[in-house]
Amino acid sequence: MSVKGITPQELAGYGIHDVNEIIYNPSYELLFSEETKPSLEGCESGTLTNLGAVAVDTGIFTGRSPKDKYIVRDDVTRDTVWWADQGKGKNDNKPLQQETWTYLKGLVTKQLSGKRLFVVDAFCGANADTRLKVRFITEVAWQAHFVKNMFIRPSDEELAEFKPDFIVMNGAKCTNPQWQEQGLNSENFVAFNLTERMQLIGGTWYGGEMKKGMFSMMNYLLPLKGIASMHCSANVGEKGDVAVFFGLSGTGKTTLSTDPKRKLIGDDEHGWDDDGVFNFEGGCYAKTINLSKEAEPDIYNAIKRDALLENVTVLTDGTVDFRDGSKTENTRVSYPINHIENIVKPVSKAGHATKVIFLTADAFGVLPPVSRLTPEQTQYHFLSGFTAKLAGTERGVTEPTPTFSACFGAAFLTLHPTQYAEVLVKRMQAAGAKAYLVNTGWNGTGKRISIKDTRGIIDAILNGDIEETDTITLPIFDLAVPTALPGVDTDILDPRKTYADKSQWEEKAKDLAHRFVDNFDKYTDTPAGEALVKAGPKL
């Protein structure tokens, strides 16, 4: 079957004119030759590494630029979006006037006009009923490569019938000279228009803006249909039992969901509808700082031809120095999901989840390694999205820095966080799923909970052993803590026992509880949030 491609007239409909050439849904072979052309310079240029993957630099933007994110406020979005300038919660959904949007669109279309363009049509979402058909337009070969890796690649038959629901125009080379007069944050912009179904990118070359941009849009569209939209990894066992893992960076989400006994559904973004859990993506976007073949063989072995490395140091002989974080600690690789062997095939979807795991790395040494959550506690801890890391101070003292990120992904939420919590709990109740809070952080010994014990805890959750054991109630946080689990050091299960003096735990617990309560105050501007206060710590 022939693929129809895209005509200059269609591009003109978006405001892009006089295009020299359209390279439609290029093959990996063509992208490889395009992005490694010797004539390319700066951020456009790709370097071949000895692993077979191409490496690129994203310039000064080595991560997302949340302060430059905007959504057009109009009749469609006015009463649905969780706006940065309304309510108690702080978020990145800054409103944009239609007039400013029109100006930004003019900048991007002018940048893309008269050029040789790459157009990639792809799906966001593995379920045909709810997926977004997205058209990406860019003048940069490796950006086309990035979205080909990260999104779901349609068949020729699907491309022949492809009518996009959403357009992403990446004008990374253009900036906004009028930003100050328009009251914007900088000359760079990542702007969305839900009425026009379009994303505009200017000034930033970071590939993740396209990935997370579409995640933000799924986070708007799906919950309004009663479908859970989740920043999580997911896997499935031999008996078809599905588990989802929520957690912020550094909590062990990727490590713990990569399990030789279970097949990976996906590593980052999922939906949960009437049929079950499904991946939004067709690829993985893994951190590579300090990556080694011994510690993370799956990711290391996925870095081969067709993978795309970002901001890594490549030595003159083509060797990649994964330990070098001089450009950024956020070095990354994108690759198609089929670079991982132990995955769900042919479509990244499975049945309903029966286990929902919230991962936190508590550096305060307060939370138990595992606790069973009630439905109300599930919503409370989902909305809290807590983790903490140890940050060194000038005097060498390490003190915990707490992070609270709603739904373990506040940066990507487009609706009020309570809407995601309500949809998740409804899905869990319909499936009879249970939720657990797993602390991969520290305890009273001053040491981090061992990966051996954490894996034992995850096994006990997945095989049901945790439901068969007695529990005690941990005061202040009111959490149900198991008294014994197979393969797990019993002495660590009650965090109070890891302190020489239990009053030390109590003092730290009260401090952390106050932080939880203060953070949760921002959700009390809705009846749903106010009702959940009693599921939190008791002071």
From Swiss-Prot:
GO terms classed as biological process: gluconeogenesis
Superkingdom, taxonomy of origin: Bacteria
Keyword annotations of the record: ATP-binding, Cytoplasm, Decarboxylase, Gluconeogenesis, Lyase, Manganese, Metal-binding, Nucleotide-binding
UniProt similarity note: Belongs to the phosphoenolpyruvate carboxykinase (ATP) family.
General function of this protein: Involved in the gluconeogenesis. Catalyzes the conversion of oxaloacetate (OAA) to phosphoenolpyruvate (PEP) through direct phosphoryl transfer between the nucleoside triphosphate and OAA.
NCBIfam families: pckA (TIGR00224), PRK09344.1-1 (NF006819), PRK09344.1-2 (NF006820), PRK09344.1-3 (NF006821)
Protein name: Phosphoenolpyruvate carboxykinase (ATP)
Organism: Photorhabdus laumondii subsp. laumondii (strain DSM 15139 / CIP 105565 / TT01)
